[in-house]
Amino acid sequence: MTAPLTLALSKGRIFEETLPLLAAAGVQVAEDPETSRKLILPTTDPNLRVIIVRASDVPTYVEYGAADFGVAGKDVLVEHGGSGLYQPIDLNIARCRMSVAVPAGFDYANAVRQGARLRVATKYVETAREHFAAKGVHVDLIKLYGSMELAPLVGLADAIVDLVSSGGTLKANNLVEVEEIMAISSRLVVNQAALKLKRAALKPILDAFERASQNGN
């Protein structure tokens, strides 16, 4: 008996916005990860299961073949580097942007002048490093995993690099968005070996995902 395909997803917005894509492929997830304690979820297709992992771990599970394919944000993929992954489709879901934000009244233009030094808090260390290096700005990067908006408020950092959707959280903490680094959306990523060895099983799902993403789900 052939092992089922494994799809890696993270809880939250990506999971919810992937459900219509799965529905387009005729598949429903049998349990809700928000209420189930299970990390391996069956679907209505006996040849497909879903595993629930941290968003930042999706590329790793796919790269090493623990999952055949997955859905990950561009932010996660840029930090990961994309090694060992085939990225055939921008799914146009979980859209937002990665931006630089500073306290209201902070002179960002002066702070990033050539040769200046800036303390930046972020969990996107590699992306932030490349961004500021391209501008000729020396940065001290402070890696955080959450509550990024707090860092400038308590003097830990001058600025943050984080994902922004509506900007409401920034505004609530008296921060302003001063520079967009990149637009973010979630992409389908496929293990390169699985693409060759399980192509017949994968192709109908990948095609359905592509059609649904192009048609706005």
Curated annotation (Swiss-Prot):
Protein name per the record: ATP phosphoribosyltransferase
One GO location term (cellular component): cytoplasm
Enzyme Commission number, as recorded: 2.4.2.17
Key words of the record: Amino-acid biosynthesis, ATP-binding, Cytoplasm, Glycosyltransferase, Histidine biosynthesis, Nucleotide-binding, Transferase
Protein family per UniProt: Belongs to the ATP phosphoribosyltransferase family. Short subfamily.
GO terms assigned for molecular function: ATP binding; ATP phosphoribosyltransferase activity
Cysteine disulfide partners in this protein: none
Gene3D superfamilies per the UniProt record, alphabetical: Periplasmic binding protein-like II (3.40.190.10)
Pfam families according to UniProt: HisG
Domain of life: Bacteria
InterPro entries per UniProt: ATP_PRibTrfase_cat, ATP_PRibTrfase_CS, ATP_PRibTrfase_HisG, ATP_PRibTrfase_HisG_short
Enzyme class: transferase
Domain notes: Lacks the C-terminal regulatory region which is replaced by HisZ.
